[in-house]
Amino acid sequence: MEIKQTNFAIIGLGGRGQGNLGELISIDGVKVVAVCDKYEDRAHRGVEIVKEKTGEEPEMYLDYKELLKRDDIKAVMVATTWITHVRIAVDCMRAGKHVAMEVGGAASIEECWQLVRASEETGKFCMLLENCCYDRNEMALLRMMREGIFGEVVHMQGGYEHDLRDEIGLGRENRHGRIHNFKNRNGELYPTHQLGPIAKALHINRGNRFLTLTSMASKACGLNTWLKNTQGEDYDLADYKFNQGDIVTTMIKCAHGETITLVHDCTLPRPYSRNYKIHGTRAAYNEDAKGIYIDGVTKHEESDWMHSWEPFEKYLEKYEHPLWKTYASESEKHGHGGMDYLVFSAFVESAMYDLEPPIDVYDAATWMAITCLSEQSIAMGSMPVPVPDFTNGMWIDRAPARRSRYNAEEICEEFFSDEEKGE
């Protein structure tokens, strides 16, 4: 496609928003004409980032509603706090702009419906910026699933397992919104990082859907222990009763019988993991083991009754997604190993040409709803709760996602050169 210069804006310039801004303006055709944050120092920093990278000065706003009055902005990226993503995205679409939101869970089911209705009524898209759908391993594994290596997929697992005790515990000092959620909520607060790739693999909202979920939370003591050890016994939150359990486990049942397990684990010491697991009738994958087991292919001694994983690395080159054959050498220059650049490129392409995004409003509503649904389940003693069908029945025979380089459900070979495909 021919590159068309397109005007973008960004709302939210904390740590994530500033990183996003730098990534966004590196994409051909993007012109950031406005930046906004309610904190003046952060908004000023947004202006500086654009000037440093492009030599041009965007307009600065402290009130995003003033920014939305402009008619020269085609699309907006929202990178604010979790509980403000949706309301701002709805206002963007109502103001005639396409919008992409950073990830996070929903505060209520009603706001998910507001998001869907705003997109349907305005014709403007809302894309969730779930970068993990574009991770190198996840895309290779998607290809393996589509080529039948796993057979019929029965169960998938994932999570957000990330030691964020400092980020959460010192959230007031650093103006970080996570702490407010941990003080007041108890649920699967950050579901989409691994649920996104899982949902795409299982054709959720296009031939399959989530039916019910049940969640359970452990006790909460990780943050208190960390705060006492690092800030002292007299720190005012050292004995605060945080509502969020240290470990939250959520199980989801799908319309075609697949099951999903999600784990949220951010307040205990551990290395980072998204705990991705795939189990099918022919093969199994385990992220933490960096391993795969393929029935009849993975070799093991007959005396090895435990059966060993073989390194996934040896399959990566063979099943590499063409996007990564193209961008692998450049990935270290971009955020989160390159997957930020890819999901932002997908957003830019969709906005530039008014195309359906690869992660659409129905995906956003469905994945984000897991947060408030898990809160309900936990509050009711881990009772099962139904997952709304935000497609209003369209999932049954909905058309496949638009084919493109950035399709997150299928590998669209026709959009890649022979060199990109490794031929």
How would you name each of these model-derived features?
Residues 262-272:
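Glycine-rich phosphate/pyrophosphate-binding beta-alpha loops
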Residues 68, 74-75, 81-134, 148:
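Beta-strand-loop-alpha-helix segment that lines the small-molecule cofactor/substrate pocket
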Residues 12-14, 122-127, 132-242, 284:
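Predominantly a Rossmann-like dinucleotide-binding segment in NAD(P)-dependent oxidoreductases
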Residues 57-75:
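A structured beta-alpha segment of the ubiquitous adenosine-cofactor-binding alpha/beta core
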Residues 1-53:
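N-terminal Rossmann-like dinucleotide-binding module
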Residues 250-256, 280:
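Active-site beta-strand termini and strand-to-loop segments that position acidic
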Residues 19, 271-423:
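C-terminal helical cap and adjacent loop that interface with cofactors, partners, or active-site loops
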